[in-house]
């Protein structure tokens, strides 16, 4: 091959390569910081629509496009709800929203706020107290994670398939779905058999009569059409609930540590005390809507009497002792945490 022909071919190849590069779309607005956000509920759930999506959108907007957060609901990146914490800790995903109850014993200090008579059917107040106590009393639960905010739902009620609950004796012998080990402690004290079932599987266990009732808030009724599988929604006098669940929205710690300060400040500004309280308020509103939905579809809202509720409260105080014993097994003194929580919840 002559040098002239060889040179001509090279020029032709280089020209084609340049034209190919020039024809490729160039995204001048590509985000500098991209995040995978994984959680366990459907994109149609109130939590996704009213809490997660607005939070994500606000951070993206305040970063002027430098941050892009892709949300993956319903465990679409794989695994079970119980895997979310390890996925975040191991960097499989960047952000998670999950119930602490899916990983029993991993957040022992925080479990206090799930107990009956600590949470008093005011999720905004519970969020405020958790925020005040986080650095000194709760942070050790969250190694490998950067907690952005914690919250609780409005509180567990008994959603019964067919049995009408009238007093403390009604619970005895019932098979009840529990969302957490703290829920199991509650059911143990009431004489019920607890069956651990993640939220996405509750409908199946109800429809197959594996359980007689589910310990769950009203909020999620419309998403899973729980009114079609239950008849009674039962709570105590004056809004008394049978404990609650704690949730976390957290980031992989290594991911957090690599972020520049200005991006960190955007996340922090949207995860301050007002957000911890706001999350609780969102869940209270959604809970009210869920109850209205059930009643509007023919379900029966049962409120136990004052005397019956007081008897239940006295029984469920024992769950505090169970929690203290569990912490002592981990060489954690739970008494100061319990005393501080009671003090702040009473303010």
Where are these regions (language model features)?
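N-terminal secretory/targeting leader peptides
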Residues: 31-122, 140-347
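Bacterial N-terminal signal peptides
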Residues: 13-24
């Amino acid at each position: 091959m002559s040098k002239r022909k060889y040179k001509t071919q090279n020029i032709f190849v280089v020209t084609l390569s340049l034209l190919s590069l020039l024809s490729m779309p160039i995204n001048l607005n590509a985000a500098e910081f991209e995040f995978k956000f994984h959680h366990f509920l459907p994109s149609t759930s109130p939590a996704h629509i009213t809490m997660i999506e607005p939070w994500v959108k606000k951070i993206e907007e305040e970063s002027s496009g430098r941050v892009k957060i892709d949300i993956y609901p319903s465990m679409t990146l794989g695994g079970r709800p119980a895997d979310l914490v390890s996925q975040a800790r191991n960097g499989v995903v960047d952000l998670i929203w999950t119930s602490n109850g899916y990983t029993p014993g991993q957040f022992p200090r925080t479990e206090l706020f799930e107990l009956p008579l600590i949470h008093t059917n005011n999720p905004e107040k519970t969020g405020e107290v958790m925020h005040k106590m986080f650095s000194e009393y709760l942070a050790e639960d969250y190694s490998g994670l950067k907690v952005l905010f914690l919250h609780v739902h409005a509180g567990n009620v008994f959603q019964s398939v067919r049995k009408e609950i009238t007093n403390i004796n009604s619970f005895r012998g019932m098979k009840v779905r529990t969302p957490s080990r703290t829920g199991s402690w509650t059911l143990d004290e009431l004489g019920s058999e607890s069956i651990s079932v993640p939220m996405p599987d509750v409908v199946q266990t109800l429809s197959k009569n594996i359980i007689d009732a589910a310990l769950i808030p009203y909020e999620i009724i419309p998403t899973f059409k729980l009114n079609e599988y239950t008849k009674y929604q039962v709570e105590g006098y004056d809004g008394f609930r049978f404990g609650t669940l704690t949730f976390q929205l957290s980031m992989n710690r290594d991911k957090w540590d690599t972020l520049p300060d200005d991006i960190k400040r955007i996340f922090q500004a949207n995860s301050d005390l007002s957000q911890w309280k706001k999350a609780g308020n969102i869940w209270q509103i959604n809970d009210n809507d869920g109850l209205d939905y059930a009643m509007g579809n023919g379900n029966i809202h049962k409120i136990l009497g004052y005397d019956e509720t007081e008897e239940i409260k006295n029984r469920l105080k024992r769950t505090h002792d169970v929690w203290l014993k569990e912490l002592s097994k981990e060489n954690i003194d739970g008494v100061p945490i319990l005393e501080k929580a009671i003090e702040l919840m009473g303010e």
